[in-house]
Amino acid sequence: MYLFFDTETTGLPKKWNAPVTDLDNWPRLVQLAWLLYDSRNQEIKSANRIIIPENFTIPTEASDVHGITTERALAEGIDLYEALNEFSSAMDDAEYLIAHNISFDEMIIGAEFLRKDVKSQLAEIPKICTMKTTTNICKIPGRYGYKWPNLTELHQHLFHKGFDGAHDALADVIACADCFFELKKSGMYQQQGSLF
């Protein structure tokens, strides 16, 4: 089964290469959305959770990107521990974890698992990054060869249109799943030497 997920956060890490155990380095989780698909590419479970901020506020610069303010998170959010346990339960069924720029999302979730002392199988499940695996498919010129496509660029390349709600975790995870299944169906992943 495929577990797609996306996070929205309080910002960016101070150091991108810091270990997950450097909890001061990694931003806090603001929103977590995930979709679990079976082997027939049918959605079987999903969640979209805003997290109640504990001992932090959401900076204006971050809420300007994803639209979630501290006030909104306090009013609409759920407890982080509950969200992590729910995601961990979904991981129990997953054969693959898939995200766009998965190395970032994995560190955000991993740091939150450590902060809450919640055990998870995050490190053990094989991962697929729709950003890094599609660089040579999108072929967007960058400073040193092709650049990593953002999710909107990948969606545009595959479907000839963007998608609504970019930087909302649910909209992003739906777009990521759509892109993955289109890549798989069209055979583009086989051409790139992927597992699919």
Model-derived features with residue positions:
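Extreme N-terminal starter segment of soluble prokaryotic enzymes
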Residues: M1-L3
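Short acidic, Gly/Ser-rich segments with clustered Asp/Glu that frequently serve as metal-coordination loops
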Residues: T7-V20
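Metal-dependent phosphoesterase core characteristic of DEDDh/y 3'-5' exonuclease domains
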Residues: K15, W26-I68, S88-F196
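Metal-dependent phosphoesterase signature
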Residues: S63-E86
